[in-house]
């Protein structure tokens, strides 16, 4: 069975107490949740349920919203793809942060924040659609992207691991050059170190098509022939046959 959505093994006791009580709706707990987001960024953990609770508080109390905390939550959500975490967080953002500018002054004041959200949403789309090379190209194309993920310790490494997990589900072997682009590892030595030490995969340099990375068989990438047998008895059509005769009569 999967882990329940509202569970997190690394969640501190005081955060758990807030989430399971009425204080989760108390605006005074906003600072506690904000500190917890900082902790997640530093310790490479992710608590989607707690982050959603904070975003809900922002929704009810827009004046308490801290743009940096929101972008950190979204950046952390990128490190757990593929999952609905990013979309859920995005859906809870206050209306004035959405990329639909209005004629009032608030729109100009939040333009930088909205641009940040748009950029993070772009990264999410690329990851969820498995456009990994384009993801890294986009991430490296603008210093603002680097600023948006700067507070998330090990961001690039966490994303690489998630990409590797998805590759392992779909491939038994993959060309090393392609994998270099997907993982944004700029040298063959770095690629070999990552796939052998982090992923426990093998590098084969003897093949006719150049260097390939071999992924061990698992329940996701194993080729299996599926045999389906369907037995349809006459009794299953008894009602249809009877109705046919009844209509004819």
Swiss-Prot record:
Keyword annotations from UniProtKB, A to Z: Cytoplasm, Initiation factor, Protein biosynthesis
InterPro entries (alphabetical): ARM-type_fold, CSN8_PSD8_EIF3K, eIF3k, PCI_dom, Transl_init_fac_sub12_N_euk, WH-like_DNA-bd_sf, WH_DNA-bd_sf
Keyword Nucleotide-binding in annotation: no
Entry superkingdom: Eukaryota
GO MF term set: ribosome binding; RNA binding; translation initiation factor activity
UniProt-annotated location(s): Cytoplasm
Subunit structure of this chain's protein: Component of the eukaryotic translation initiation factor 3 (eIF-3) complex.
Protein's name according to its UniProt entry: Eukaryotic translation initiation factor 3 subunit K
Lineage, highest ranks first: Eukaryota, Fungi, Dikarya, Ascomycota, Pezizomycotina
């Amino acid at each position: 069975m999967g882990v329940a959505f509202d569970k997190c093994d690394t969640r501190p006791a005081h955060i758990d107490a807030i989430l399971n009580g009425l204080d989760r709706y108390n605006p005074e707990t906003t600072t506690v949740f904000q500190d917890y987001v900082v902790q997640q960024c530093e310790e490479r953990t992710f608590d989607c349920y707690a982050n959603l609770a904070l975003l809900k508080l922002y929704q009810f109390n827009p004046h308490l919203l801290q743009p940096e905390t929101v972008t950190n939550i979204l950046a952390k959500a990128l490190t757990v793809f593929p999952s609905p975490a990013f979309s859920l967080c995005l859906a809870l953002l206050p209306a004035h942060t959405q990329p639909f500018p209005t004629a009032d002054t608030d729109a100009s004041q939040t333009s930088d924040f909205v641009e940040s959200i748009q950029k993070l949403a772009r990264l999410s789309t690329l990851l969820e659609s498995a456009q990994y090379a384009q993801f890294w190209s986009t991430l490296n194309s603008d210093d603002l992207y680097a600023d948006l993920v700067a507070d998330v310790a090990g961001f690039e490494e966490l994303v690489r691991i998630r990409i590797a997990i998805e590759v392992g589900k779909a491939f038994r072997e993959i060309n090393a050059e392609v994998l270099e682009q997907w993982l944004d590892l700029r040298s063959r030595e770095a690629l070999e170190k990552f796939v052998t030490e982090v992923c426990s995969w093998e590098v084969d340099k003897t093949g006719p098509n150049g260097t390939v990375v071999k992924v061990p068989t698992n329940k996701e990438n194993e080729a299996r022939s599926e045999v389906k047998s369907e037995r349809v008895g006459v009794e299953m059509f008894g009602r249809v046959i009877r109705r046919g005769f009844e209509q004819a009569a």
